[in-house]
From Swiss-Prot:
The carboxyl-amidated somatoliberin is twice as active as that having a free carboxyl end. Its main location: secreted. GRF is released by the hypothalamus and acts on the adenohypophyse to stimulate the secretion of growth hormone. One of its GO terms (cellular component) is extracellular region. The modification Leucine amide is found at residue 44. GO terms for biological process: regulation of protein localization. This is Somatoliberin. GO terms for molecular function: neuropeptide hormone activity. PANTHER family: GLUCAGON-FAMILY NEUROPEPTIDE, SOMATOLIBERIN. InterPro entries: Glucagon_GIP_secretin_VIP (IPR000532), VIP/GHRH-like (IPR046963). Belongs to the glucagon family. It is found in: Secreted.
Length: 44
C-alpha cells in the first residue's frame, strides 16, 4: 500500500518536473526567436 502511494506520488513529481522542463524549453526557445527578430530589426 505504501509502495503504491510512493510510486504514485513519484510519478506525479516526475510529471511535474518534465512539464516544467518542457515549459522552460518552450519559453527559452521563444526568447531566442524574439532576440533574433530584434537583431534583424536592428540590422534593417
Amino acid at each position: 500500500y505504501a509502495d503504491a502511494i510512493f510510486t504514485n506520488s513519484y510519478r506525479k513529481v516526475l510529471g511535474q518536473l518534465s512539464a516544467r522542463k518542457l515549459l522552460q524549453d518552450i519559453m527559452s526557445r521563444q526568447q531566442g526567436e524574439r532576440n533574433q527578430e530584434q537583431g534583424a530589426r536592428v540590422r534593417l
